[in-house]
């Protein structure tokens, strides 16, 4: 969590470095629309534009480049101070878990909320990479990292790294009750699937291939940066179906929506909890995740 860095400063730096609103927004698990509005609000506040916009491209203009050169060293210093305070303040009292930001949004939101539900736990988004796993865990920046992505054999063989497999996460489909009388396999083929933007980076397509292609189903998958509730609303209206984790079924209205599994057998997504070997809170963290998904957390 940023302490001294303002949201406008952070968003400006991210956009300057990525030249893409959607990618910049993904890094902090925002959707593109509010991120773009924050940049427009910044430009309005200072009284001049910072970016050149052409079609889908965006880049710093001359004024933006000058501001970036002045601001980036300040941003780096403040970021270092934020990290120092965060790390020193939490070492004695908190477990910090990094949540892979490629998770489907509803799963990401459930995991990030562990920090609100369990005393002594802080959850924060991370951009998953093999080097990031090594650096964050071995340098004690994070106690745990949870991800649907598996590291290579090179990293698996590190002596001080532990990889705990979580119970496979059951995934199914949500569709409007107006299709109550239709065959589920027909709906999977005919209705477009509406998914969050982040899911196409979390081995989602590979999972779909493994489960759908053998059934002869070739879905049309549409990725949109919707919130969970916006996605559910679109499904309720009958325009789409969508994939959700089974634990999220209790969060929607069963009078208007129907849950069903994939043909022949349910789909499952594997997850991994990374930590330093013999971390004393590994079992505790695994229990927190399981309880929260079962709906038995305190």
UniProtKB/Swiss-Prot annotation:
Keywords: DNA-binding, Transcription, Transcription regulation. It comes from the Bacteria. GO terms for biological process: DNA damage response; regulation of DNA-templated transcription. Residues 21-40 bind DNA. GO terms for molecular function: DNA binding; DNA-binding transcription factor activity. Gene3D superfamilies: Winged helix-like DNA-binding domain superfamily/Winged helix DNA-binding domain. Residues 1-61 form the HTH lysR-type domain. The keyword Repeat does not apply. InterPro entries: LTTR, LysR_subst-bd, Tscrpt_reg_HTH_LysR, WH-like_DNA-bd_sf, WH_DNA-bd_sf. Pfam families: HTH_1, LysR_substrate. SUPFAM superfamilies: Periplasmic binding protein-like II, Winged helix' DNA-binding domain. Belongs to the LysR transcriptional regulatory family. This is Uncharacterized HTH-type transcriptional regulator YgfI.
